[in-house]
Amino acid sequence: MADAAAPGEDDAAWERAIAAAVKNAPFSAPKTLTLDGAVKSTTGRLPSPSLLGRYPSLEELSVAGARLSSLAGLPRLPALRRLSLPDNRLSGAASLAAVAESCGATLRHLDLGNNRFADVAELAPLAPHGVESLDLYQCPVTKAKGYRDKVFALIPSLKFLDGMDAEGNDCLDSDDEEDEEEDEGEEGEGEGDEEEEEEGGEEGEGDEDDEEEGDEEEDEEEGEEEAEDEEDEAGADEEDESKVANGSKGSSGSAQPNKRKRDSEDDANGDN
């Protein structure tokens, strides 16, 4: 009876864990579901397909440390790109066949670290699909002779195995790449702001120089105008003085002939 009740008990625990995980999701149809350590399965299985099947929009699913020994019943997840199942008890081709059937067409990242896969042949169900990154760290298979070469040969789409490419170069996790791109974008924005501030400062200095030059030019023009006004006033004064002088001479010259005329007339009258 206890064995018969175990699956139901597991499902109840899984349902509570899933409800808690999606409670704070920003969308009604979450794209990421993390159940790491949320349930310690008594049956070694995932929850009933109907529980995970409620979220067909999932792109990332993580179920680490749940004591899973089988992936039977993994529902169809047509959008899943990343599946993380480390620290479980998984082994055998059957588990990976369930993965291939559930999300083989879209899956790109598969983490099976610290499980019980012991032979490269167990990975065969992944061969026809597009997995690009596979982690098998701390699995017995990693100790097999020629392990890396054999896995790369088995899965043509594979780019990274246990964090390294076929040449042994470290890969950069996609999350790290996104963080670096954001940092570069922020640095670019910061440099752009500094350049704008410098340009603004140069423009401000240029405006100040222009204003100073304009003020100097205005002062020079005002000085020239004042000088011209003084010259005009001096010229006018000279003209006035000249007119006055000329007028005085004209008056004395004209008076002498009149006096002579009167004297002549007086002489003539006396003779008569």
Swiss-Prot record:
Superkingdom is: Eukaryota
Query: For this UniProt entry, what's an example GO CC term?
Result: nucleus
Q: Which residues form the signal peptide?
A: none
Matching entries from InterPro entries are given as: AN32, Leu-rich_rpt, LRR_dom_sf
| Acidic residues biased stretches | 164-241
Which SUPFAM superfamilies does the record cross-reference, listed alphabetically?
Answer: L domain-like
**Keyword set, alphabetical order:** Leucine-rich repeat, Repeat
Secreted is among the record's keywords: no
Region annotated Disordered, chain positions: 163-272
> At which residues are the LRR repeats?
57-78, 79-100, 106-127
- Tell me the ranges covered by the LRRCT domain, including all copies: 139-184
Recorded GO molecular functions are: histone binding
Compositional bias (Polar residues) at which positions? 248-257
Which family does this protein fall into? Belongs to the ANP32 family.
Name the chain's protein.
Acidic leucine-rich nuclear phosphoprotein 32-related protein 2
Q: What is the lineage of its organism?
A: Eukaryota, Viridiplantae, Streptophyta, Embryophyta, Tracheophyta
